[in-house]
Amino acid sequence: RHRSPEAIPRMSNPRWHQSLGLGRLWLRYYHQPVGKFLSVMRQGGPFAMRETERQRQEMEAAALALPPLPPPASDSPLCLHLLTGRRFWYQTAFCLHSWVRAAGEPIRVELYDDGTLDGVAHHLRRFGPAIKVHPRAEIIARLDHHLPADRFPVLRERWINYPNIRKLTDVHAGRDGWKLVIDSDLLFFRPPTFLVDWLRSPDRPLHAVDCLESYGYTRPLMNRLAGATLQPLVNVGLCGLNGSTLDWNELEAWCAELIAREKTNYYLEQALVAMLTARQSCAVAPAADYLTLPSKREVLAPTAQMH
């Protein structure tokens, strides 16, 4: 339905300013259009975005045809933990199949619902008894018990608005022992010997090596909070931690001060792990074998164990 020009609010109308506010005008007519444009360009432009979407649909269809995973022994020490959801389930499927094919033996898998898994969880459960899914309701109940919002307001706020923090909270809060968390978009091409050896006998934290240091916060502040000098290039695409040793009060305090002094940042989770690992020796995945930014040549003809 068309409206007459007189019915359309004009920016010169004082009532328009009062009802919408200058801040909302700035958001609507500048920040949102500019943000959308920059997002499109970061993804290579509209044609690249369409091609990416076409390939995503092909990958989803291919994931539906993948066979079940071989059943592991119930007490197998080889267990991977992944956060996943509607946008990532097919990546998770290929990640797990590539691991089993490269490692040559079954793996137990624990998946953590990012809040969007309900409609696609059956696609992952059909891979058989190797898969255990932690539903959102179960995760929230555990967090409410071990990280109640009145005692951990910053961690719980970040849990709502910053899903990456869930790779720490959802996997480790209220649970003991070593766990290896990996990103859903990883693929394995050679036997992941380093990771298998760690899983069989974990005795220190594990992390990958980044292609570019990305902590999101200044080193002096992070060093002071950690009480130690951070190691360079810590990457959490592979992250092995012992939930029994995590001090959640300390993590809450770190988050609060980092955000109060230098605002929120996409790399907060990586910053926290870099601070945790600064105080102890770590198992560091060999950068040449576990790549975080493979070249086009490597992508087309993989020689590394993972990327």
What residues fall within each predicted segment?
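N-terminal anchoring/stem segment of glycosyltransferases
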Residues: 12-147
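Short coil/turn segments at beta-strand junctions that form active-site/ligand-binding loops
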Residues: 76-78, 105-107, 176-178, 203-204, ...
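GT-A fold catalytic core of metal-dependent nucleotide-sugar glycosyltransferases
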Residues: 163, 167-213
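A short, conserved beta-to-alpha structural element at the edge of catalytic cores
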Residues: 206-227
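Catalytic core and acceptor-binding pocket of nucleotide-sugar-dependent glycosyltransferases
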Residues: 211-213, 229-307
